Amino acid sequence: MPSFDIVSEIDRHELTNSVDQANRELEMRYDFRGVEASFTLSEKSVEMAAEQEFQLEQMLLILNTTLSKRKVDLRVLGDSTDQKSGKQVKRSYALKEGLEQKVAKDIVKKIKESKMKVQASIQGDQVRITGKKRDDLQEAIQLLRGDESLDVPMQFNNFRD
């Protein structure tokens, strides 16, 4: 029986390249001359540091641009937390990786509500979709891609006939 997996993974290499490119762009921009501002990437977050609040907004635009150029889904950036320390303002964005249980249940619910001839099962941090025909699986992929209420980056992999 044909099947595929729905996962939420981050391409770490492209994410690292995006953050490096954003740092290079910061050095080149005229409005950031003489300003201590930087992007740092850790295992679970992307951190921005600048001197003013409005500079963080500009930095977010730079980061979003570099992420989209590298074809990294912008939804990988989760909730932000702000900190003020001395003359610097820091904003940290958590990285979303893996499907949470609630999101996985929503995916299964949407598949079942659509009354397609496929079965969905949750397997850890991924959802496996199985069906009798390849066309049914492709229809399920189109349904999930078109759904705006699911606010997670999804990849469809491990497609088997």
Swiss-Prot record:
A Pfam family reported for this protein in Swiss-Prot or TrEMBL: DUF520
Keywords per UniProt: Nucleotide-binding
InterPro entries tied to this protein: DUF520, UPF0234-like_C, UPF0234_N, YajQ-like_sf
Record's protein name: Nucleotide-binding protein HCH_04620
Family: Belongs to the YajQ family.
Cellular component, GO, one term: cytosol
Origin: domain of life: Bacteria
Task performed by this protein: Nucleotide-binding protein.
GO MF annotation, one: nucleotide binding
